[in-house]
Regions:
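Interfacial helix-start motif at the membrane-water boundary
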Residues: 50-69
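Structural signature of multi-pass alpha-helical membrane transport proteins
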Residues: 10-54, 72-84, 91, 95-164
């Protein structure tokens, strides 16, 4: 029997199933992912990051950010290794993509961009665009488009972290 190399699709499926199983443990009261990063709507940048579950509230938002990056990097690096790709190049590129993406996602979650009219008073603001925190995806997407078009050499160096799966 020939040694069959794993495809990106199969590795993506395995990683997705692994994360799903970890999340599904919550059904039995075992929360192993409550420390994962949550990007909040904010007016004070110090409130932008938190953990997803208040049971982990002793962990700062920045610690959650770093732990989320480390866990994602480790899991995805295993997948990259299974594909026979260069893990070092992937880790470097993924680190840059992760932090750039999270920075711009956080900017999109600013209350002046994200707060709906009924949330303005909660944040002490008198106006907002009202796009909800999903606006962070739009801001991060725009940043990616700008980087790929204005800095093609940088975009090429980050290609190892931008697999479609």
């Amino acid at each position: 029997m020939a040694n069959k190399k794993l495809t990106e699709d199969s590795v993506a499926l395995f990683i997705g199933c692994f994360v799903f199983i970890l999340a599904a443990l919550n059904l039995w009261g075992v929360d192993v992912l409550g420390w994962v990063l949550k990007t909040n709507m904010w007016t004070n940048m110090g409130d932008a990051f938190s953990v997803t579950n208040k049971a982990y509230s002793g962990l700062s938002g920045i610690a959650s950010l770093v732990l989320t990056w480390a866990a994602m990097t480790a899991v995805l690096a295993v997948g990259i290794k299974c594909l026979g790709a260069n893990v070092g190049r992937f880790v470097l590129a993924f680190t840059i993509v992760f932090f750039i993406s999270e920075f711009f996602f956080m900017l999109g979650a600013n209350a002046h961009i994200a707060a709906t009219p009924n949330q303005q008073a909660k944040f002490g603001i008198t106006w907002s665009i009202g796009l909800t925190t999903e606006a962070g995806f739009i801001v991060a997407l725009i940043a990616g488009i700008l980087i790929s078009n204005l800095f093609p050499a940088l975009a090429e160096k980050l290609r190892d972290a931008c697999r479609p799966e």
